[in-house]
């Protein structure tokens, strides 16, 4: 449900996290494309700025409401909504960030619990993600980029690193345009990448946090 995913993104005050936990060395990202790729990065792309009221509104409109008064929202059918979150074990700042994520989500009425109750050692984390562990609903990860921002290597239908396993005809069509000879035209290439960045924001199958 894109409304649920967007709500989870709007609930996070990642700019504050970057300032307080990383001494201002990391900042909130507005796009799945990083500013390093200045030719195609869209600085005007709408991002998920901290907006808990908007997050609550999205959940209300989508039918995720607190029907029993315990402060936590239920599924649309009234059943308990519990979301399992997986995150890597890293440094002390990351541990604090993970706990803050859980708190921010609780503030908008979402019951999000850590998978196994704690963060996961790096290799085990990726083993579970690659194995499509059915108990993991959401995960926090990161990646490095080369010198080509083409998204097919991360989000293509058969991409090895498409850990989100999210594929739909619209996204596939945009990626094909980015990889087409038509994209040799600089203006077209910029247009296609802007389309991709907006698509990722709207679907929110992945949402960027810190860069």
Question: What would you call each of these model-derived segments?
Answer:
Residues 93-96, 123-125, 148-151:
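Extracytoplasmic/secreted cell-surface and envelope-processing proteins
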Residues 2-3, 99-108, 122-136:
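Short helices/loops that flank or line small-molecule/ion binding pockets
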Residues 119, 136-151:
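Ligand-binding clamshell of periplasmic/extracellular solute-binding protein-like
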Residues 6, 18, 111-124, 152-211:
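Extracytoplasmic/peripheral linker and loop segments enriched in polar/acidic and small residues
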Residues 1-103, 195:
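Append "and occasionally in soluble cytosolic enzymes with long acidic Gly/Pro-rich linkers
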Residues 1, 38-57, 67-81, 127-134, ...:
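Short, solvent-exposed loop/beta-turn-alpha elements that line the ligand-binding surface or hinge
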Residues 1-5, 13-17, 80-82, 107-112, ...:
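Loop/turn elements at helix/coil->beta-strand transitions in domains of secreted/extracellular proteins
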């Amino acid at each position: 449900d894109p409304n649920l995913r967007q709500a989870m993104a709007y609930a996070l005050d990642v700019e504050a996290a970057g300032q307080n936990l990383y001494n201002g060395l990391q900042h909130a990202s507005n796009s799945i494309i990083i500013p390093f790729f200045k030719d195609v990065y869209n600085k005007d792309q709408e991002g998920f700025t901290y907006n808990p009221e908007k997050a609550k509104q999205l959940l209300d409109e989508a039918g995720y409401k607190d029907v029993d008064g315990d402060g936590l929202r239920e599924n649309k059918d009234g059943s308990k909504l519990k979301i399992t979150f997986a995150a890597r074990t890293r440094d002390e700042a990351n541990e604090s960030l993970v706990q803050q994520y859980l708190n921010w989500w609780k503030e908008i009425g979402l019951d999000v619990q850590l998978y196994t109750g704690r963060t996961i050692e790096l290799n085990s984390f990726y083993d579970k993600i690659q194995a499509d562990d059915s108990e993991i609903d959401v995960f926090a990860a990161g990646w490095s980029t080369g010198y080509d921002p083409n998204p097919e290597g991360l989000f293509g239908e058969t991409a090895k690193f498409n850990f989100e396993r999210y594929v739909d005809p619209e996204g596939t069509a945009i990626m094909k345009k980015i990889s087409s000879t038509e994209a040799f035209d600089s203006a077209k290439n910029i247009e296609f990448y802007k389309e991709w960045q907006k698509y990722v924001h709207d679907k929110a199958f992945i949402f960027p946090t810190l860069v």
